[in-house]
């Protein structure tokens, strides 16, 4: 049995997309005393799954569940975040057959089994942005190493508009917060 989720500081985190997708793959889910009992009967079977919106968590869970499912799973309206691509690279290195990660349609051709591998997980862009924000609000300087610059392209102009200066060199980003942050338009 799995415990039902409770959400976080930002609010509730509904899992209906996850449960619906898992059901389409052959998972039978019953609620029992505040928990969920999940069974698969004859195993998981590939299917076409269309998400109502591109959820990162639901896309990841579908990828993980269908990688060893029998047949082909196609995820429509899949999340396109870098974390999806990284998970696909990892699973493919373990023997999976996943294509289309980073696009709105992902195709997973189920395999019988996965094997181990050595893999370096990509840099966490959310953690990097958190440290950048800390430097910005305190007027400090920070250098972040081993980042993926393209994953931060959308936030760098915002920091610049707020008065921060930054310098990219390879996979390192140095950012300096201003004495006083500028309002954003």
Protein language model features and the residues they cover:
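Structural preference for solvent-exposed beta-strand-turn elements
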Residues: 1-185
């Amino acid at each position: 049995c799995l415990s039902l989720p409770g959400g976080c500081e930002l609010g509730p985190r509904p899992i209906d997309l996850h449960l619906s997708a898992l059901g389409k793959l052959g998972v039978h889910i019953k609620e029992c005393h505040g928990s969920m009992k999940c069974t698969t009967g004859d195993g998981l079977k590939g299917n076409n799954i269309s998400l109502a919106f591109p959820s990162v968590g639901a896309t990841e869970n579908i990828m993980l569940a269908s990688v060893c499912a029998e047949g082909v799973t196609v995820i429509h309206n899949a999340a396109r975040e870098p974390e999806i691509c990284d998970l696909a690279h990892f699973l493919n290195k373990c023997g999976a057959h996943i294509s289309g990660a980073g696009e709105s349609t992902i195709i997973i051709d189920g395999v019988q089994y996965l094997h181990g591998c050595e893999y370096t997980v990509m840099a966490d862009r959310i953690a990097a942005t958190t440290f950048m924000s800390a430097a910005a609000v305190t007027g400090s300087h920070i250098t972040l190493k081993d980042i993926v610059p393209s994953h931060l392209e959308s936030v760098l102009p915002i920091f610049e508009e707020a008065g921060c200066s930054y310098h990219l060199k390879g996979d390192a980003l140095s950012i300096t917060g201003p004495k006083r942050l500028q309002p954003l338009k």
